Design a protein with these regions (language model features):
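N-terminal glycine-rich, Lys/His-bearing helix-loop that initiates the first secondary-structure elements
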Residues: 1-37
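Conserved N-terminal alpha-helix of the aminotransferase class I/II PLP-enzyme fold
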Residues: 28-78, 98-99
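Short hydrophobic alpha-helical segments of the AMP-binding
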Residues: 61, 107, 181
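Short glycine/serine/threonine/alanine-rich loop segments
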Residues: 67, 112, 186
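Conserved beta-loop-alpha segment that forms the PLP phosphate-binding cup at the N-terminus of a helix
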Residues: 68-93, 103-105
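General beta-strand structural signal in soluble alpha/beta enzymes
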Residues: 71-74, 96, 116-117, 157, ...
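Substrate-binding/gating loop at the entrance of the active-site cleft, primarily
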Residues: 96-121
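Active-site phosphate-binding strand-loop segment of PLP-dependent enzymes
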Residues: 125-190
């Protein structure tokens, strides 16, 4: 492992996937699948359009969210690309407890700015404390007042906070951040 890391310049994105036994870089697509999930792949309707599996998915998403439009994407980064190409752009700022790397990239590609507002304890790595993924609520409100709510298309709460070590966010912090966002009429995007 040491030689692999050294060869990669200590950059985890340069480590070939076949050299990784357990992926601790991300939680995307690395979980074990059940026998039923694998069987579902084998039974999958691979029609170009009108696949039965899409309608099952669409119905479930509509029931959960109440939203009519459902656009499936292969991963979160593709959804981010669509979202930020629509709501992003120069002069806009996206606030977050901490942007995930692909989220930040998609925000910045749109011409907008990404600002992280983690609680101070999040950066004290040796300190053991619950909910180090929380947003700093005072900093959030101060930044909204500084920039003006009209320049902030949405606030992003990343749960769990991957960029800061997978730290959890408390429900209390999420509720209070939501109240601040509602007060300033800024949509809260739960990632």
């Amino acid at each position: 492992r040491e030689s692999i890391l050294k060869e990669a310049g200590y950059n985890l994105f340069n480590v070939p996937a076949e050299k990784v036994l357990i992926d601790l870089l991300t939680d995307s697509g690395t979980s074990a699948m059940s026998a039923e999930q694998w069987a579902g792949l084998m039974r999958g309707d691979e029609s170009y359009a009108g696949a039965k599996s899409f309608f099952v998915f669409e119905r479930a998403v509509r029931e959960l969210t109440g939203m009519r439009e459902v656009i499936p994407v292969h991963q979160g980064r593709a959804a981010e690309r669509i979202l930020f190409s629509i709501v992003g752009g120069p002069g806009k700022t996206f606030l977050s407890n901490s942007h995930f790397d692909t989220t930040r990239a998609n925000v910045e590609v749109s011409g907008a700015s990404a600002v992280d507002l983690p609680v101070p304890s999040a950066l004290e790595f040796a300190r053991s404390e619950p909910f180090k993924g929380n947003v700093d609520l005072k900093a959030l409100e101060a930044k909204i007042q500084e920039l003006g709510p009209e320049t902030i298309p949405l606030f992003i709460m990343t749960v769990t906070n991957n960029s800061l070590g997978g730290q959890p966010v408390s429900m209390k912090n999420l509720r209070e951040a939501s109240e601040i966002c509602r007060h300033y009429k800024i949509p809260l995007f739960l990632d």
